Amino acid sequence: RVLRENRGPDGGLYVPFREPVFSREEIDALKEKSFHQCVAEVLNRLFNTKLTRWDVEFCVGRYPVRLVNLPQRIIAGECWHNPEWTFDHLVHILAEQLRGGCPGADGGWAKTAVGIAVLFGIFGEFARAGITEHEKRVDISVVCGNFDLPMSAWYARAWGLPIGNIICCCNENGNLWNLIHHGQFRTDTVSVPTGTPEADVTLGANLNGTVIARNIDVQAESHRT
């Protein structure tokens, strides 16, 4: 059902009933696997499917994600190397493979799950390059107009991936900044076009899911303490 529709019958968002936890040995083993193998194994674990690395490579191509070194020890992950030049196409083609070619939904948990699998694949590339390990966490930065990847990073970190801070970058529109620092979020504001159009949206995609996940995590931490 989660691959066929974005929301449940009651309008709520789908979340995993049981969250997998990857051991340190499993994380260390990522460097021995290809990007496609990492993606296949994570999706199989989440959806109880039997994808192979060849299934993933046939769907998304040999190099669907490329890492570009920038100054200040920054690495850009380009997730748009596909015929449509968008990350959404990567999500669509993998979700379609999981559904066996049947029509369905590409948003919601399906998109979050693909994002998690892609992050595991990227961290496998990092490990092979000696960039990261368990004692050396990597911060992730994304623009604030779309919270699908921050949501995926949140789950991936909780499941064992060595992710440090998850940074959501705002521009001068600053609606998200007001929400985080002042507890206010206005939906009647007018966005000013900038050089970062994805951050110009008034309400970022999947912001509600990210807030819910954050609150659940804070509540769990308070119970532990």
Report residues per predicted region.
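PLP-dependent amino-acid enzyme catalytic core
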Residues: 1-225
